[in-house]
């Protein structure tokens, strides 16, 4: 499939089956995120894969999950990201967006649908990036 066809195929899916994402497909999606370009190749992205029932229930406290069996939370370490010297712009948000887009297109190439969710409670998501996640 050519790139434009792939880009047109990807859409914001809001209804999912309970079928688990195969590990090989998930690995391909995560690899697409790993090789995504980032400012000065700093790779500030941090990915949290959520697949367990308990994890998805915890995630539901942060945002609506639309019944998806798997979620990838894309975060970025601002201390690791490149900063533009002229105005001090830290591009961690841009890097995270590029990584997310690469993974979503990889998923589409594997016939998996995705949804980019930006409507979430940041304080609730901290549970996934702190020691509290282990409690």
Map each language-model feature to its residues.
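Conserved small/polar residues in nucleotide/adenosyl-binding loops
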Residues: 128-135
């Amino acid at each position: 499939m050519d790139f434009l066809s792939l880009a047109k195929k990807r859409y914001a899916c809001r209804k999912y089956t309970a079928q688990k994402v195969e590990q090989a497909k998930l690995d391909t999606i995560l690899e697409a995120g790993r090789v995504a370009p980032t400012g000065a190749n700093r790779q500030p992205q941090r990915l949290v894969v959520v697949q367990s029932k308990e994890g998805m229930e915890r995630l539901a406290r942060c945002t609506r999950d639309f019944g998806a069996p798997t979620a990838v939370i894309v975060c970025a370490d601002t201390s690791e990201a490149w900063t533009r010297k002229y105005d001090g712009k830290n591009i961690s948000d841009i890097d995270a967006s590029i990584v997310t887009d690469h993974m979503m297109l990889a998923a589409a190439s594997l016939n998996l649908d995705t949804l980019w969710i930006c409507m979430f409670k940041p304080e609730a998501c901290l549970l996934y990036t702190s020691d509290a996640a282990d409690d």
